[in-house]
Amino acid sequence: MRRIELAWAASILGTWAYGIAVVVYAYDQGGATAVGVVGLARWFAAAIASPFAAILGDRYDRRWVMVGSDLARAVFIAGAALAFFADAPPIAIYVLAGLVSVASTAFRPAEAALIPSLARTPEELTAANVAASTIESVGIFAGPAIGGLLLAGAGAGVVFLVTGAAMLWSALLIAGIPPSAEAKDQDDREAVSVLDELLAGFRTIARERRMRLLVGLFSAQTFVDGMLSVLIVVIALKLLDTGQAGVGFLNSAIGIGGLFGALAAAALVGRKRQAADFGIGIFIWGVPIALVAVWPNQVFVLVLLAVVGIGNTIVDVSGMTLLQRSAPDEVLARVFGVLESVLLLTVGLGAIVAPFLLNWLGTRGALIVAGSLLPLVVIPAWPRLNAIDRTAEVPVERLDLLRASPIFAPLPGATLEQLAGALEEVRARAEEEIVRQGEPGDRFYLIKDGTLDVYVDGELVQSLEPGDSFGEIALLRDVPRTATVKARNEVVLYALDRRHFLAAVTGFGPSLSAAEGVIGMRLGTGRGGIVRA
C-alpha cells in the first residue's frame, strides 16, 4: 500500500507542476485566450477519454495499466521538453499536453480499483483513501509551488523534464507492487464488444440505486466546484479587493483546509456511518460559499474556504470508500472512469454557468445561489443516505466466517463485505438434508452453529463443525452434488448463491487457486476433514 501512495504522490505533484508550466507557456505565447483554449482542450480530451481508458483497468492487471499511464505521460512530457528546447511551434506542445491529459485518465480509475484488492479490512480501505486524499490536498498546492519555483529559476523546459522524471519514479514504484491474482486472465474472459465494455460502468451505476445517489451528489459538488473556480476570482478582486495575489491566497485556504480535513477524515476509519459523513461533507462544502456573501471579511472568508477544503476531503474519502465497497470488482475501474468523466463535465458546466449567474444576480447573489445548491440537494437525500448506512452494516460474525474459509480468505476486504451482505441465513432441524448426492447444486454453505454429517454412497465419511463449509465442487465444476450432507442436530448455516460465489471466486486468482486446491483434496480423499459436496 505504501508504494501505491508514494506513486500517487509523485503523479499528483508532477501533474500539477506540469499543468502550471503549460499554462504559463500558453500565456506567454498567446495570452489569456491561449490559456483558455488549451485548458478547454485538455479538459475535453480527458472527459471523452476517461470511460474508454478505464476499460483497461478492468481488462488487464491494474498495476501495469498505471505503469503504462505513467510511462506514456513521461514520453509525452519529454516530447514537450524537446519541443520547447527546439523552439518548435506552440501547437506541438499544446497537442502533447492534450495527449498527457488523455494518458492520465487511465491512472486514477485503475488506482481506485486496485486499492480495495490491497486492503484487507474496511478500516484499511478507509485509511488508504484518507492517505490518498491527503496526498492530493498536498499536491494541489505543493505541485504548483514546485512548478512555479522551477519556472522562475529554470524555465518551462526544465519543469517538463522534472515532471517527466516524476512520472518515471511513479511507474517504478508501482512496478514493485507484488503481483496478486488481481491480474486479469484474458483466456477466461468472454469476448465482448468495446461498446459493451464501455457501457458496463454506466449500466452498473444506472442499475444500483445507491451508486446513482452517490454519483449524483458527487456531480452536484463538482458543479459547484466549477462555479467556485470562477467566483473565487471575483471574491478576491471585487468583494475583498486583495488583487491578483488574493486569488492564490483563497485557493491556498481551500488546500490547507483539505489537510485539516484529512485529520477529520481519519476519524472516519472504522465508522459505520460513511454515507452520513458523505452527506455532511456535501453540506459543509456549500454553506460557507453562501456565507461569504453575508460578511465579506478577509479573515472570515479565508476560514470559510478552509471549511470548504475540510468538506472536500470528507466527501472524497467517504464517497470513494462507499463506491469501492458498492461496485463489483470486475467493473470497478469502469465505474470510476464514468465518475471521472462525469466530474470533469460538471466542473466545466459549473464554470460556464457562473458568469451568467454573476451577470444576472451580481456577486453576492451568485454566491448565495451557488452555496445554497448543495444543502438543497443533500437534505432531501438524507433518508436515502441513512438507508445506505443501514444496509451497509454487515455482522462481524459473517465476515469472520468468510475470512476463516480457505476459499474466501485471499479475497479483498471490499469483496468480502459484498459477499457477507449476500449471505442468506438457513436453519435446519436434526436429520434434515441440506444437500443430496446426485442433485444439482446452486448454493455454497458456511456453518455457523451445529454439526452436520457427510455421506458418500450412503456411507458416513465425515462430520462438519462450525467454521467448516461445503458445496463448492458442484458450483465450480458444474456437476451434481458429490455427497449428501445431513444435520445431526439443529444447525444454522449461511448460504451463498451460485452467482455471487462464482463471481467472487473465479474473478480473483488466489481465491480460485485456493478453491481448486480444496477441490483436489476433497475429490482425492473424500475423507480426513474435508467434505465432498
Go through the PLM ranges and name each one.
Residues H500-G520:
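Amphipathic alpha-helical "output/dimerization" segments
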Residues M1-D389:
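Alpha-helical transmembrane-bundle signature of multi-pass membrane transport and export proteins
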Residues L96, L304, P412-G421, E516, ...:
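Short, well-structured alpha-helical segments
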Residues R398-R477, R481-A483, A503, R532-A533:
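Regulatory nucleotide-sensing modules
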Residues T163, A366, G467, V485, ...:
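Residue-level signature of catalytic and energy-coupling elements of molecular machines
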Residues D478-R499, P510:
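Ligand-binding loop in jelly-roll beta-barrel domains
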Residues P375-F408, E516, G524, V531-A533:
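Membrane-interfacial segments at transmembrane helix termini in multi-pass membrane proteins
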